[in-house]
Regions:
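Hydrophobic residues in well-ordered beta-strands that form the structural core
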Residues: 131, 152, 214-216, 296, ...
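Helix C-cap/helix->beta junction micro-motif
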Residues: 46, 146, 209-210, 331, ...
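Conserved glycine-rich beta-strand-loop-beta hairpin in the small C-terminal domain of fold type I
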Residues: 314-325, 335-354
């Protein structure tokens, strides 16, 4: 079997004597990030200590303007258009226009989260999909759900290496396996870093040469720590073949409201892909929730109070992520500097010998299990994102350290020095103590 293709795992019978299962193969395991979130909740309910650093939830309360907008539309009980209501699509189009990308409202499709739109796009495009290694957990799983192969291509900061991508696509097609799309994450989850414009341009060149549709997941684009740093989207280089997705779960911390939007490609491909995506949407989610669409239209119109909220969120995420990165680095891990969102991606390989001798750790799963079992620190092994488990990498999320109440979270949001707040400082001290003992 091609090692770059994610296989489907068989479902075992529930009992040894039960005979063959009537179910088919498992196309996707339970999401590791959502499983980690439920595990953390279960530990809390049992009264066990938890330092929640596994789940990438933005960890801040909804802005009052958005709560009011949601409540005011509670009577919107009809289904509405599959693509989303016109005010939302017009607001989303204006969001991209303010970023230098003129967009027609007809090029926008809304869905119940960008996650659903990503799956819908894979199903609409068909064929195999090239995915960066490492990358967000759900890309490969969604490809499997759509009955497609996910071809894992080495890369960094959410963008597959251009040369490796070209070779992977050529080899797959030569063996009769079509590859029709490539997914990039800008900025990246799990690494919390941002790809260079040259890397994005090189990927676009390969996509043009091999006729690949680019799906650019830009859910973290508004949470770049340095807003002045150059940011390159594939749509700037290949607008006729790039779909851009985003949503409100990260920049405005509305993960539970489930609202995302896709900007379809310019040129002839956009209307064709729109028709196919709406076909998928009509059979799966019908339409996004009406009240949420009303609040989202306000969000994408970007009134000053909401842009200020995003600015403060970006500052908070950056300061806490950098503080955690410094602690991990001081403990001996190799840590890329966080550039966006609320993720840190330490590599404990420099400590592999000591970890093996002291704790019997030989994989990233071992390390993550030890941290939660012995110290109550919940993180994810990088192998959940496609890495080899022998590399002792972890994905550390920092956004649930901001407090247990809305009052604490708002204090963190407005603080010039959030890491000095007692509840955040206590979490950082707990991390320091575990790292010291780990060595």
């Amino acid at each position: 079997m091609d090692p770059t293709v994610v296989p489907l795992r068989p479902l075992p019978s529930p009992h040894p004597d039960a005979g063959p299962s009537p179910l088919g193969p498992v196309r996707a395991p339970f999401s590791a990030t959502l499983a980690a979130n439920e595990m953390m909740d279960a530990r809390r309910q049992r009264g066990e200590p938890v330092l929640p650093m596994a789940f990438g939830e933005a960890g801040l309360p909804a802005h009052p303007l958005l709560r009011e907008a949601l409540a005011s539309a509670a009577d919107w009980t009809s289904y509405g258009p599959v693509a989303g209501r016109a005010p939302l699509r017009e607001a989303a189009a204006s969001y991209w226009a303010r970023r230098g990308l003129p967009t027609d409202a007809d090029a926008i499709v809304a869905g119940p989260g960008s996650k659903a739109l990503l799956f819908g796009l894979m199903a609409a495009i068909g064929g195999g999909v090239a995915v960066c290694r490492p990358s967000w957990i759900s890309y490969a799983a969604q490809a499997s759900l759509a009955g497609q192969a996910a071809h894992l291509v080495p890369g960094s900061s959410g963008v597959p290496d251009a040369g490796d991508l070209a070779r992977t696509v050529a080899a797959a097609r030569a063996s009769g396996r079509p590859v029709r799309s490539v997914i990039v994450t800008l900025p990246d989850n799990p690494t919390g870093t941002q790809a260079s414009p040259s890397a994005v341009r090189a990927l676009c060149s390969v996509a043009d040469r091999h006729d690949l549709i680019i799906i650019s997941d830009e859910i973290y684009a508004d949470l770049r720590h340095d807003d002045d740093a150059e940011f390159a989207s594939p749509v700037s280089f290949s607008p006729e073949r790039t779909v851009v997705t985003t949503g409100l779960s990260k920049n405005l911390a509305l993960g539970g409201w489930r609202l995302g939007v896709a900007r379809l490609p310019d040129g002839w491909l956009g209307p064709e892909l729109r028709a196919r995506l709406l076909g998928v949407a009509s059979e799966i989610w019908s339409a996004p929730a009406g009240p949420v669409q009303h609040a989202a239209a306000l969000a994408f119109s970007e009134p000053a109070p909401l842009t200020e909220r995003i600015t403060l969120s970006r500052r908070l995420h950056g300061r806490v992520a950098r503080s955690v990165a410094r602690r991990l680095s001081a403990a001996g891990a190799s840590v890329p500097a966080p550039q966006a969102a609320f993720y840190v991606y330490p590599d404990f390989t420099p400590l592999a010998g000591a970890l093996r001798r002291r704790h019997g750790i030989t994989s990233d799963e071992d390390l993550a299990a030890l941290l939660v079992r012995q110290y109550g620190i919940c993180v994810l092994p990088a192998s959940a994102f496609g890495e080899e488990s022998r590399r002792l990498r972890l994905r550390v999320a920092t956004s649930l350290l901001y407090g247990d109440t809305d009052a604490q979270r708002l204090a963190a949001l407005n603080s010039a020095d959030p890491c000095a707040l007692p509840w955040i400082a206590a979490s950082l001290d707990q991390l320091d103590e575990a790292l010291e003992d780990l060595r």
